[in-house]
């Protein structure tokens, strides 16, 4: 199947996801080697166009591009013509005319990558759009899970935290359910959007129910900057009822994985002792991010392989 863009995981097949993850395993060998340089993207140009702040996602895309010998450039909206009023489409068309092969975009508006993709010849990768999707984060999460669990079919993944504002949660639900995993969400009712169960996941009444016999326990950051009003009484009350603590983690399987997309609010959605425990693969998620993004860029520039 040929695919010009990766705008989300909604509608992406199991075969496509498996192909990306298999390719990422090969790219991980490059990331772990002493010579992090290949010629896979030699002659290609990659631009990261970020309208929101980012550390992990932007840096991993930039490193992925450079490890494969692409010409890589970063555009910050605040330091470009966007600050002068240039539209997203005009910016995209300008980059297109400069011969850009892939545009990686992060934008506060849901659907912005889809809009951009309709107006440019370059491949467009969604690096996070509003509260919609963050497909590469879900792919790196699945790569990390698959490496430790041996597969995703039948795995129970508990996702705990600010589901309402989380594009990571949505992409993980799409991807994990496609791969046959069982996704369980838990959060205060005010942080669970309506009709989430229609996406193929279940909603647990308590974090204890979500963690029970789970293969993976994933925390989500409480995104206070996206909240228009207080959706829970206080941080202290949130912690009392919903924080991932050692006691709650103990309800999961003995070797259950602890995950978090970052950045973390330690002592809010996840206890520091849990984030740093032997079951935590949070730092490995970062490594997986570079490998997944290398794989995706490689495959998008050779569309017959996607």
Stretches with model-predicted labels:
Residues 68, 119-121, 179, 197-200, ...:
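Short, structured coil segments at secondary-structure junctions
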Residues 35-143, 266:
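Phosphate/diphosphate ligand-binding glycine-rich loop within oxidoreductases
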Residues 196-273:
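Rossmann-like adenosine-cofactor binding region
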Residues 51-63, 147-220:
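Glycine-rich phosphate/diphosphate-binding loop of Rossmann-like nucleotide-binding domains
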Residues 1-59, 63:
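Positively charged, low-complexity intrinsically disordered leader regions
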Residues 41-46, 153-157, 255:
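Phosphate-coordination loops involved in phosphoryl transfer and adenosine-cofactor binding
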Residues 255-256, 261-306:
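Adenosine-phosphate binding glycine-rich loop
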């Amino acid at each position: 199947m040929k695919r010009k863009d990766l705008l989300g995981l909604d509608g992406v097949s199991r075969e496509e996801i498996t192909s990306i993850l298999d390719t990422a395993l090969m790219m991980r060998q490059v990331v772990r080697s002493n010579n992090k340089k290949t010629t896979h993207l030699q002659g290609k140009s990659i631009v990261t166009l970020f309208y929101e702040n980012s550390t992990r996602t932007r840096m991993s895309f930039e490193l992925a591009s450079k490890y494969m010998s692409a010409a890589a450039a970063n555009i910050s909206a605040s330091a470009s013509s966007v600050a002068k009023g240039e539209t997203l489409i005009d910016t995209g068309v300008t980059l297109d005319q400069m011969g850009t092969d892939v545009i990686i975009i992060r934008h506060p508006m849901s659907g912005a990558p889809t809009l951009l993709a309709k107006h440019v010849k370059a491949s467009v990768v969604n690096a996070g759009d509003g509260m919609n999707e963050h497909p590469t984060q879900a792919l790196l999460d699945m790569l990390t899970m698959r490496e430790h669990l041996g597969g995703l079919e039948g795995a129970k993944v508990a996702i705990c935290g600010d589901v309402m504002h989380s594009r990571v949660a949505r992409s993980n639900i799409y991807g994990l359910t496609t791969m046959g995993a069982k996704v369980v969400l838990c959060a205060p009712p005010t942080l669970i959007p309506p009709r989430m169960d229609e996406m193929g996941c279940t909603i647990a009444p308590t974090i204890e129910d979500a963690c029970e016999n789970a293969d993976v326990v994933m925390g989500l950051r409480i995104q206070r900057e996206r909240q228009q009003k207080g959706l829970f009484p206080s941080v202290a009350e949130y912690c009392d009822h919903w924080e991932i603590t050692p006691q709650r983690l103990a309800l999961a399987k003995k070797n259950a994985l602890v995950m978090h997309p970052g950045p973390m609010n330690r002592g809010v959605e996840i206890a520091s002792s849990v984030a740093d425990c032997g079951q935590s693969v949070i730092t490995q998620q970062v490594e997986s991010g570079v490998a997944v993004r290398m794989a995706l860029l490689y495959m998008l520039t050779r569309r017959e392989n996607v």
